[in-house]
């Protein structure tokens, strides 16, 4: 019985160490795996239908002091360019910030394999998520009304009140590394 308990304890410690170590490696892989010039297509959905597809590019390159240039280009003309800066805040906890260089700074977090920011602007709440699958960089943007569309539930301890939000849009991009 004591040997079984020791075995279980060792196995638990080994699994815990493995999970901690893989989390550490995942944190170390970011943003290094994102470095480069990525190009692809951004699908913009309105309701269930694909409304528009445009070109999108993301450039991520080391700048200084642990910061990175984070440059997003929308469309083929190359006129809609967003020159942002990725800034480390508390990288051990996966906390970064995107400085839009106009007074807007958005928190963004590494959670698992995804890099996610949630914010509200002009009445819309927006969630942006980046991650890498295989050799592709994927991006999702979800948007919904900032104010609840309606409420549900009873407002009791057993059945709390729940705010329900009207969904307004979804964008999805699939990008591959490219030579600029």
Q: Language model features by range: what are they?
A:
Residues 1-30:
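Bacterial Sec-dependent N-terminal signal peptides
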Residues 29, 39-69, 154-156, 162-180:
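Short, solvent-exposed loop/hinge segments that bridge or flank secondary-structure elements
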Residues 42-127:
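Central antiparallel beta-sheet cores of small beta-barrel/beta-sandwich binding domains
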Residues 36-40, 68, 137-141:
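A short hydrophobic beta-strand element
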Residues 95-180:
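Beta-sheet ligand-binding and adhesion/scaffold domains
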Residues 25-39, 51, 62-63, 87-88, ...:
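N-terminal helix-cap/turn-to-beta initiation motif at the start of protein domains
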